[in-house]
């Protein structure tokens, strides 16, 4: 049948409730390799250039995890048990040494003790706020 309409979670038009800058270490992609991902795109400058990048890029799951940690620490009191779901769309790359800007909008109880949802947008500060993660939603208790 026909595909149904897509509902992308757009960030509200108001200013974010919170914003946090998360520095990414220069050696972060090399450290992240300890998780077992040996893709040379994250460590080999020549391979990265062949793939069309200026230099090796950070693992997407690393930026994904750093974002969830920033949201959890900022709006959920660091309590990971409150997270019910986390969804996002990878919108761009992160280079080691850059800074992630995580902007957050809280619905429901505003990130307090009750349940609700947080919409986030993540960008790379050093590249004129280039999008990194989009359509990001964290459902929480």
Give the predicted meaning of each segment.
Residues 1-20, 96, 101-141:
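HotDog/MaoC-like acyl-thioester-processing domains
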Residues 24-26, 35, 92-94, 106, ...:
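A broadly conserved detector of short glycine/acidic/proline-rich loop/turn motifs that flank catalytic sites
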Residues 1-58, 72, 76:
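Catalytic strand-loop segment that frames the active site of acyl-thioester-processing enzymes
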Residues 63-101:
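Hydrophobic beta-strand-centered segment that forms part of the acyl-chain substrate-binding groove
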């Amino acid at each position: 049948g026909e595909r149904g309409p897509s509902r992308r979670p757009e960030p509200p038009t108001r200013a974010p409730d919170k914003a946090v800058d998360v520095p990414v270490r220069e050696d972060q992609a090399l450290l992240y390799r300890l998780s077992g991902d040996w893709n040379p795109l994250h460590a080999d400058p020549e391979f990265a250039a062949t793939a069309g990048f200026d230099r090796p890029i950070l693992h997407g799951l690393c930026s994904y995890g750093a974002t969830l940690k920033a949201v959890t620490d900022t709006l959920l009191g660091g309590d990971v048990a409150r997270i019910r779901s986390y969804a996002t769309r990878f919108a761009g790359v992160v280079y080691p040494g850059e800074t992630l800007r995580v902007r957050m909008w809280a619905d429901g109880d505003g990130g307090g003790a009750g349940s609700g949802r947080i919409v986030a947008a993540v960008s790379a500060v050093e590249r004129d706020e280039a999008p990194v993660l989009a359509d990001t939603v964290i459902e929480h208790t």
